[in-house]
Amino acid sequence: MASPALTGGYRNLTAPVSLLRTLASTRVTTPLFRSNKHSPRFISSPKRFTCLSLLKTDSQNQTTLSSSSNSGYHEYNRLMPCPAYNLPPRIEHMVVLEDDVLVSEFISKQLDLPPLYVADLIRFGAVHYALVCPKPPPTATPEEIILFEEVTSPSVLKKRSSIKGKTVREAQKTFRVTHTNQYAEAGTYLRVHVHPKRSPRCYEIDWKSRIVAVTDSYVILDKPAGTTVGGTTDNIEESCATFASRALDLPEPLKTTHQIDNCTEGCVVFARTKEYCSVFHTKIRNKEVKKLYRALAAAPLPIGIISHYMRPKNMAPRLVAEDSIQGWHLCQLEVLECKKIPWPDAATEKKHDIEDCGWTSKEFAYECTINLLTGKTHQIRAQLAACGAPLVGDSMYMPAAIAEMGNPDTNPYGKAKKHYTMEENQKETAVAEWIDRHGKEPRVGIGLQACQISWDDDDGEHFYEAGTPWWR
C-alpha cells in the first residue's frame, strides 16, 4: 500500500545518502526470549554498530559502514537457493532522517547488505514501513526513547502532509515495502527482517498434485504439512498461496481466506478475486462454513462436545481451562467418531518427519473425526492435550500433557484448579512454569488433517475432501 511517504518512481536519487539512526538491532534467541508478532522482545547486538549511532556522510557523500564480515554477521549474497536451516533472527529497526530516500538503496548502505539481497528481502515481504515510528518497547534505551520523542513530537508531525487526517496510531500502522523503487520521507520508520524464516518444504512438493478443485471464484488446496497458508511476517514468498498460484499459472496471485496451522495438512480455500475473498470471510464470520478434521490422538476421546476456555493472549502455547475465566474465550469441538488404530510405525513417522515427543505407549493411536464448532488458533491441539489425548507428533503440547499426567498440579488451570487458591505472584510463577512445560512448534507435521470443508452459495452446496492422511 503506497502513501505520500513511500512512493514508487524510476528516477535517480540526487539527494545524498540519508542520515540514519538505529532504533534497535534485534537478535531474538529462543527459548530465552519469547515474543509475539505485535510486541517483540528487543536486545541490542554488541557486534553491530552502536544503537542510535549517527552515521554521517563525508564531503563526498560516502557513508562509512562496517562490513558484514567485520561485524560478525553472516556473509550475505542472495536469499536463493533456499537453505535447509534458518539463521538466527535479526531484525533491524530504523528511522529515516531525510526526505526523498530510495528505500532499497538506503537499507543496502546502512546495513551493509548487497543490493540484490535487499531486493530479495523486499520480494519476500521482509521489509516493513510506517509513516510514524511506533513506540519503542519497555527494554528501549534512553537514547532510543529520545530519538522516538524527537521524530514523533507534535511540532514535527504537524509539518508532515502525509499524515494529515490520520491519528498518530493510524500513522504508526506498518505496511510492506513492495517494490525496490519506493521512496521514503523523513520520519519514516523501517523494519527489516534480515534473516526471514525459510520454508524449504515448499520446494519438495508437487503442488499441482495437491490441487483439489479450481473454479472461477476459488481454488481448493490439499495443504501439505510443514507449510504456511499465506506466509509469515517476514516471508510471503515461500507459502501455499504463492506456490499454488505458480503451479496453476494464474494471472493474479491467490488470496488467503482462512488459516490452518503450519503443521496441519488438508483443505484450504483460496479466493481468486478480492470480491470472493470478502464473500468467504463473511461466511466464516457467520459460521456458514463447516470444517471437519481427522485427528490422530495418543489416547481415546469421548464422543460428544468438549468445551474449554482459552486465554486471550495471542501467543503460543495457547492455554485452556475447563472452567470459565473472565475474559477467556469459549472453545468447543465435537468428537463425532473415535476409533482405535495401530500407532504409525517408525518408518512412516520418519518419512513424514513426525517427531517423537516422549509418549511411552505406542501400540495404538486413536483416529477421531472432529467437528470444529469454534475456530481458535491451536484449538484442537490445545483441547485434546488438556484431555490427556495430545496429537501424535505435537512437540508443543504433548510434553505438557505428559507432565500433567505425571503431576496434575503442574497445570494451574487443570483438574487441580490451583489458580483458585493462589496469590497473584504465585499464579504468575505457576503459569510461567506451565508454559515452560510446553515444547517448540513441530518442524513439519502432526496427527491433524482438515479433511472436509463445505458451505452453501447461491449456486448450491460446495463440498470438498482432502486426500488420505499421512498415517494411513
Swiss-Prot record:
Enzyme class: isomerase
Catalytic activity: a uridine in RNA = a pseudouridine in RNA
Domain S4 RNA-binding: 101-208
Main location: plastid
Annotated active site: D261
Enzyme Commission no: 5.4.99.-
GO terms (BP aspect): pseudouridine synthesis
Keywords: Chloroplast, Isomerase, Plastid, RNA-binding, Transit peptide
Cellular component, GO annotation: chloroplast
Listed InterPro entries: PsdUridine_synth_cat_dom_sf, PsdUridine_synth_RsuA/RluA, RluA_PseudoU_synthase
Localisation per UniProt entry: Plastid, Chloroplast
Single annotated GO MF: pseudouridine synthase activity
Transit peptide location on this chain: 1-66
Pfam family, one: PseudoU_synth_2
Family: Belongs to the pseudouridine synthase RluA family.
Protein name: RNA pseudouridine synthase 6, chloroplastic
Annotated organism of origin: Arabidopsis thaliana
Source lineage: Eukaryota, Viridiplantae, Streptophyta, Embryophyta, Tracheophyta
